[in-house]
Amino acid sequence: MFNANVNDYMNNFFLYDSATGQLELNTPEILLVKEFEALLDAERNKCKQDPKGIYKLRAFREFRYIYLAIHWNSPYADYFAKDRHEEALKDAEMTEEEFEDPLFRAACRKFKEL
C-alpha cells in the first residue's frame, strides 16, 4: 500500500503551467530528498542571468530534463531512450556537460528509484 501512495505522489511531482510555460514542483516536500535538494543549492545555480543563484535557473532546467526524459507521463515517454534524452536535453536547454554533473545524475537515479 505504501508503494502505491509513493507512486501516486511521484506521478504528481510536477505541474506544467501552460500560461507561463513554467514547470513547477507540485510537491515541495520532495525537496526533503537530499538528491533533489542538492539541485537547488544557490552556489551551483549561479549563472550570467542569475549571478547570485537565487532564481535557481539551472535547477529549473534540470527538473525539466528529469520530467521530459524520465517521468512516465512525459510527452517523450514513447520515444527510444536515446531520442528521449536528446529531445529532453534540447527542450531543457542543457548541455552534455551539465547532464554529466554528478549531483544531477544522482537526482536522475533517485527519481527513477521512486
Q: Predicted segment positions?
A:
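N-terminal, charge-rich alpha-helical recognition modules
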Residues: M1-E113
